[in-house]
């Protein structure tokens, strides 16, 4: 792995597709590092928040992984060649692996092709990650066994907002969409409160109502549960983008 690859991607990827390199609030992180405890800790920090990780090993092929490397849990391993990919699959059979050749070391690709492949990889990883998150949310909502579409939709949006809070990235449109849904929906308030209790998000919902009142356009009359401007509300305010 040449040291210039991360800079090549960061400096040029935005010209290929929709990927934008950011310093804060990433949707996906590409980690370049050695098989080490430090790398493991870095990746676990992102995956714990629910941020997908692509990992490129900076020290290439290794015959035996040290014990701490078993902690490594990237969403996808990027390898520069098939030999490295085969070794990863041998050591970690369940790993998701993608081979993208480094244009600095082979004539089988060029910079534009390589960047396009990384762009497509990032888009695919993010899309699949979001689909998995939504599937998990839908499964939780289905456990309510409620036919009221409005309650199901509101609970789904609250659960996604809870996930976004864990990622420390709350987009303003999420708040505005939830405000709109609450304002334009008719539902049984008692059933709604029971649903929030069943999902164990009643406390979180009270914090969200205060957030929507201060940072979006929701008013008290459209709240399914009383607002509470508490510590959680203040923490969420810090992560609105």
Give, region by region, the residue ranges found by the protein language model.
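Short glycine-rich, flexible loops that bind phosphorylated cofactors or substrates
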Residues: 36-38, 62-63, 86
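N-terminal subdomain of nucleotide-sugar transferases
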Residues: 1-21, 51
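A conserved, positively charged/aromatic
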Residues: 61-75
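A charged, aromatic-enriched C-terminal amphipathic alpha-helix characteristic of glycosyltransferases
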Residues: 101-122
């Amino acid at each position: 792995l040449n040291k210039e690859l991360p800079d090549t991607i960061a400096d040029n990827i935005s010209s290929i597709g929709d990927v934008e390199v950011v310093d804060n609030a990433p949707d996906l992180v590409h980690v370049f590092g050695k098989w080490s405890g430090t790398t493991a800790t870095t990746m676990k920090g992102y995956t714990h928040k629910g941020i997908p990780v692509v990992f490129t090993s900076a020290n290439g092929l290794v015959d035996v992984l040290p014990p701490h490397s078993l902690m490594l849990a990237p969403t996808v391993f990027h390898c520069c060649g098939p030999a490295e990919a085969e070794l990863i699959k041998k050591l970690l059979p369940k790993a998701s692996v993608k081979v993208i050749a480094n244009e600095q070391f082979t004539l089988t690709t060029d910079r534009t092709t390589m960047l396009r492949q990384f762009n497509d990889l990032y888009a695919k990883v993010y899309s699949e990650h979001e689909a998995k998150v939504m599937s998990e949310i839908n499964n939780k909502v289905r456990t309510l066994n409620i036919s009221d579409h409005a309650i199901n939709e509101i609970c789904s949006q609250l659960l996604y907002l809870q996930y976004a809070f864990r990622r420390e990235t709350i987009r303003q449109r999420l708040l505005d969409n939830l405000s709109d849904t609450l304002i334009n929906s008719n539902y049984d308030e008692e059933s709604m409160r029971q649903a929030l209790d069943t999902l164990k998000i009643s406390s979180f919902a009270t914090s969200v109502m205060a957030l929507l009142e201060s940072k979006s356009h929701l008013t008290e009359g459209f709240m399914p549960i009383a607002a509470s401007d508490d510590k959680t509300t203040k923490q969420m305010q810090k992560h609105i983008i």
